[in-house]
């Protein structure tokens, strides 16, 4: 198996957590559906092919730097005399992510080539969150192996974290571990779709020591939980 490692450092990022219409909260990392959707856009895939790509690629992410959390407030004008409801949007300014994708050689190589010469402009999240490479060689293909590890820097599966873990801080700008329901797939019914979620624990600025070694994929030696 081979993998694709993509290092990005956008000016801003927003990955909406869909639970409140007046608070546009954000995951502090690109969810699985967003990251694979970014590849699908770069590859110029229609919806049906995007659905197929979701089944062909595994995904993991390391939050190298969460960036600065920014709150943006706006009021939408409706009609004269109507009550005004301010809407708050959470953004992350200049975060730094390492995205990991694993799958069949043909699929991974096609995704890699698409990032170098995309059909559509890659976005990370909403339409204001443009994809910015973190460095010149921002995408690379690496060897991937199965393994077990207890020292992890990537987003962790919630079930493994709940068995026991401790967070070791390495940087001043950090995020303490917090559980999220990350969208990992979609169920389609007619013209509509519904997200499928998985419990994960995200953090930044350090690493997690799990109580027990867990199954991971090693991307050129880097242990990553893949969903």
Model-predicted regions and their roles:
Residues 1-20:
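N-terminal, Lys/Arg- and Ser/Thr-rich interaction peptides
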Residues 3, 56-58, 96:
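Extracellular structured ligand-interaction cores
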Residues 7, 60-62, 100:
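Residues in well-ordered beta-strands of folded domains
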Residues 13, 27, 89-90:
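Flexible, active-site-adjacent loop/turn segments at secondary-structure boundaries
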Residues 16-81:
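Glycine/small-residue-rich interface belts in oligomeric ring/scaffold proteins
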Residues 64-227:
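Internal, well-folded beta-alpha domain core
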């Amino acid at each position: 198996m081979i993998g694709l490692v993509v290092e990005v450092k956008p000016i801003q990022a927003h990955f909406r957590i869909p639970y409140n219409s007046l608070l546009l909260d954000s995951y502090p990392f690109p969810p699985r559906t967003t990251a694979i959707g970014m590849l699908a856009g770069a590859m110029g895939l229609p919806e049906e092919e995007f659905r197929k790509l979701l089944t062909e690629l595994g995904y993991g992410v390391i939050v190298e730097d969460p960036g600065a959390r920014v709150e943006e407030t706006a009021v939408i004008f409706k009609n004269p005399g109507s009550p005004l409801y301010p809407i708050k949007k959470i953004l992350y300014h200049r975060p730094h992510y390492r995205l990991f994708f694993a799958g069949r050689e043909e699929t991974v190589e096609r995704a890699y080539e698409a990032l170098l010469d995309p059909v559509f402009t890659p976005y990370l999240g909403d339409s204001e969150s443009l994809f910015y490479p973190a460095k010149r060689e921002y995408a690379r293909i690496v060897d991937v192996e199965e393994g077990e590890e207890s020292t992890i820097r990537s987003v962790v599966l919630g079930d493994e974290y709940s068995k026991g873990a401790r967070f070791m801080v390495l940087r001043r700008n950090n995020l303490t571990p917090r559980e999220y329901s990350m969208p990992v797939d979609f169920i389609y019914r007619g013209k509509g779709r519904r997200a499928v979620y998985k419990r994960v624990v995200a953090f930044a600025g350090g690493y997690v020591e799990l109580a027990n070694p867990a199954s991971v994929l090693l991307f050129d030696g880097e242990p990553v939980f893949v969903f």
